[in-house]
Amino acid sequence: LHTQWPGTGKPRDPFFDQFYASQVQLMVDPVKTQDYAQKALSALLDRIGPAILLTHSQSGTFGFLVADKRPDLVKGVVTVEGGGMPRGFTPVGPPRWFEDAPPPDVTWGITSIPLTYSPTVAEARQLTFVRESMPAPGTLVRCWVQASPARQLPNLQRMPHLLVVGEASAASSTNHCVSRYLTQAGVRNTWVNLGDVGIHGNGHMMMLEKNSLEIAAFLAGWLVDNVEKGRRTTS
């Protein structure tokens, strides 16, 4: 259950109204959005130096793209409730639970603009995706992955990745497919449903919810173990 949102979650509730007032328009073209974000954030890293990337929702793909463009400057990537699948899913309920959403016009796997693959990919149509024959244990969807042999993502292999979803979020049913795509491409990553680590009741906007400090502590602990200590181990 979604129990951590403050207030009623309905209009005229002060928490909801404050949240709603913060919302702004977004660009609906993922190609332009991702291109602008990759260029701007890469330029920022060039100025400030090495960093850990923390992304959420629509910006989830930005972390992958910046890490791909500046692998020497990205020490780790934390993707909270992020997108990035070759194909999405539409919930339909039992017994099928999910159907495939319409395919995107262009996909580079987990992004809408080019990533660095090995062997090299010059055009998105060179990538071939297949649906897994069975859902992963404990899940209800058959993920879309690369046809075998899978091309690798060498730049993303150079840093650890954490993918996090809330227990009560819609992403908890499908977001593991991003992790499976990364794993197939040789990228070390950890996928966590917060409910599985004892953090319960969160939805998509977990950073605004009542237990957000508990979530922040979990993320910080993972970064210490996998970025700070990992760097010491490999140095």
Question: Where are the regions that the model predicts?
Answer:
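Conserved acidic catalytic loop of the alpha/beta-hydrolase fold
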Residues: 4-6, 10-52
